[in-house]
UniProtKB/Swiss-Prot annotation:
Organism for this UniProt entry: Streptococcus gordonii (strain Challis / ATCC 35105 / BCRC 15272 / CH1 / DL1 / V288)
GO terms for biological process, alphabetical: diaminopimelate biosynthetic process; lysine biosynthetic process via diaminopimelate
Family membership noted in the UniProt record: Belongs to the DapB family.
Protein's name in the database: 4-hydroxy-tetrahydrodipicolinate reductase
Cross-referenced HAMAP family: DapB
Active site: 145, 149
GO cellular component terms attached to this protein's record: cytosol
Binding site for (S)-2,3,4,5-tetrahydrodipicolinate: 146, 155-156
Domain of life: Bacteria
Protein function: Catalyzes the conversion of 4-hydroxy-tetrahydrodipicolinate (HTPA) to tetrahydrodipicolinate.
Main location as per UniProt: cytoplasm
PANTHER family documented for this protein: 4-HYDROXY-TETRAHYDRODIPICOLINATE REDUCTASE 1, CHLOROPLASTIC-RELATED, DIHYDRODIPICOLINATE REDUCTASE
């Protein structure tokens, strides 16, 4: 029997990519689609729902969520309460919300994943950045995304900064007396480092982590040119979370 999947936010670009991936994998079975704004009642024989409450009692194993930060927390909590293992690519969770969801997953003995990025290359970039920061503590992050992305900085950039801050002491970068002639010119502040967000049409998801030291520099970069790049990670996550009994934050915990 295949793993039964619900996709929330299936009308969005990531949701459409997830739909294609799930329907093309013989080990997965799509049993429900959720989108509050569609008039469709079914797609290729799969029922479509407008409200998550309509999915209560549906026989499913995994809830794949590519919605919006505004509803992702409530969706993930609902999924766990219904016995679905959540695989969530929506960003914008607070540390308190993550802790609440992890606690709930332990109570329910359900695996799950919230990941700022499902591209394996992006996960490796974050790991490489954490390694480099031990030797190059002066660092800035530039993340670049399409102009319809709602949150800034990206979840990937924040996760990268968190990993870096775990391996280097907090430090002030730049001149001690620097001044911004235009507010925000130096980017967002995170534990001594700066994060810069770019939003332009034509982009998908890109990130640079730039390290500087005496007489040398190191730049790490990852590019997602197509949303298909995320689906390898989503597929892996779906097949892994059903074996687990706790929600984790970051795809690296499933690799």
């Amino acid at each position: 029997m295949g793993i039964k999947i619900i996709i929330a936010g299936f009308k969005g670009k990531m949701g459409q990519a997830a739909y294609k991936m799930v329907t093309e994998d013989p080990e997965l079975e799509l049993v429900g689609l959720l989108d509050p704004f569609t008039d469709e009642k079914e797609v290729a024989g799969v029922p479509v729902f407008n409200a998550k409450e309509e999915l209560a009692g549906l026989e499913a194993h995994v809830w794949v969520d590519f919605t919006t930060p505004k509803v992702a927390y409530d969706n993930t909590r609902f999924a766990l309460e219904q016995g679905f293992c959540p695989v969530v690519g929506t960003t914008g969770f607070t540390p308190e919300q993550l802790e609440e969801l992890i606690t709930l997953s332990r109570e329910k003995q359900l695996g799950g994943l919230i990941a700022p990025n499902f591209a394996l290359g992006a996960v490796l970039l974050m790991q490489f950045a954490a390694q480099a920061a031990k030797y190059f503590p002066n660092v800035e992050i530039i993340e670049l995304h399409h102009d319809q992305k709602k949150d800034a900085p990206s979840g990937t950039a924040i996760k990268t900064a968190e990993l870096i801050s775990q391996v280097r002491p907090s430090k002030q970068q730049g001149a001690a007396d620097e001044e911004e002639s235009i507010a925000g010119a130096r980017g967002a502040y995170f534990d001594g480092m700066r994060i810069h967000s770019v939003r332009l049409p034509g982009l998908v998801a890109h990130q640079e982590v730039i390290f500087g030291s005496q007489g040398e520099g190191l730049t790490l970069r990852h590019d997602s040119y197509d949303r298909a790049s995320f689906m390898t990670g989503v597929n892996l996550a779906i097949k892994e979370v059903v074996k687990r009994s706790e929600l984790v934050y970051g795809l690296e915990h499933l690799l």
